């Protein structure tokens, strides 16, 4: 059997103006079709708290260490703490108490990387309160922790066990003088 082989010569040539192969988009409509009304600069409808500026005061920055969420506020009362715990329970977060005996304020010890704001490790008070449904249970544990460690910083955290993240953390108790 005889084999016949044929070759076809192809000529490739670069197009001198390949950028012009796509036509420019010309489908924009003129502005005449869109009615535009020119409004005067009227700022009377914008929200303002200008009348209340005199009563707003910031936390004094000198000599005050920053702790956790809500650290710019005065110390929370028992009722306010209970409301915060109710909030984390409504969000189905697991309450947990942690305490620190030496440094309750932010500083870097164990981690120097910028990914996590703080290198501290706090000691957990008992186990996370899985199944807790009442803020009174958390407040009872807080009182026990304060009784055991009166010179400790104690914080309450809310842990989302589905997403495996800590969602809220705030100082519940500080030593005298802080």
UniProtKB/Swiss-Prot annotation:
Molecular function GO terms recorded: ribulose-bisphosphate carboxylase activity
InterPro entries per UniProt: RuBisCO_ssu, RuBisCO_ssu_dom, RuBisCO_ssu_N, RuBisCO_ssu_sf
UniProt transit peptide range: 1-54
Subcellular locations according to the entry: Plastid, Chloroplast
Pfam families named among the record's database cross-references: RbcS, RuBisCO_small
Chief location: plastid
Coiled coil: none
Entries under Gene3D superfamilies matching the protein: Ribulose bisphosphate carboxylase, small subunit
Keyword Ribonucleoprotein: no
Gene Ontology cellular component list: chloroplast
Keyword Ion transport among record annotations: no
Other known facts: The basic functional RuBisCO is composed of a large chain homodimer in a 'head-to-tail' conformation. In form I RuBisCO this homodimer is arranged in a barrel-like tetramer with the small subunits forming a tetrameric 'cap' on each end of the 'barrel'.
Free-text function comment from the UniProt entry: RuBisCO catalyzes two reactions: the carboxylation of D-ribulose 1,5-bisphosphate, the primary event in carbon dioxide fixation, as well as the oxidative fragmentation of the pentose substrate. Both reactions occur simultaneously and in competition at the same active site. Although the small subunit is not catalytic it is essential for maximal activity.
Quaternary context: Heterohexadecamer of 8 large and 8 small subunits.
Protein name: Ribulose bisphosphate carboxylase small subunit, chloroplastic 2
The species this protein was found in: Flaveria pringlei
Gene name linked to the record: RBCS2
């Amino acid at each position: 059997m005889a084999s016949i082989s044929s070759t076809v010569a192809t000529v490739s040539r670069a197009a001198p103006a390949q950028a012009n192969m796509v036509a420019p988009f010309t489908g924009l409509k003129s502005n005449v079709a869109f009615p535009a009304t020119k409004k005067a600069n009227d700022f009377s409808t914008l929200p303002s708290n200008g009348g209340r500026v005199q009563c707003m005061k910031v936390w004094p920055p000198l000599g005050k260490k920053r702790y956790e969420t809500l650290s710019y506020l005065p110390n929370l009362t028992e009722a306010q703490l209970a409301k915060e715990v109710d909030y984390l329970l409504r969000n189905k977060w697991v309450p947990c108490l942690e305490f620190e005996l030496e440094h309750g304020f932010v500083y870097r010890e164990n981690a120097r990387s910028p990914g996590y704001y703080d290198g501290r490790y706090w000691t957990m008070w008992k186990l996370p309160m899985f199944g807790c449904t009442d803020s009174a249970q958390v407040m009872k544990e807080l009182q026990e922790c304060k009784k055991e460690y009166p010179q400790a910083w104690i914080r309450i955290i809310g842990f989302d066990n589905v997403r495996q993240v800590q969602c809220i953390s705030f100082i519940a108790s500080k030593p005298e003088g802080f």
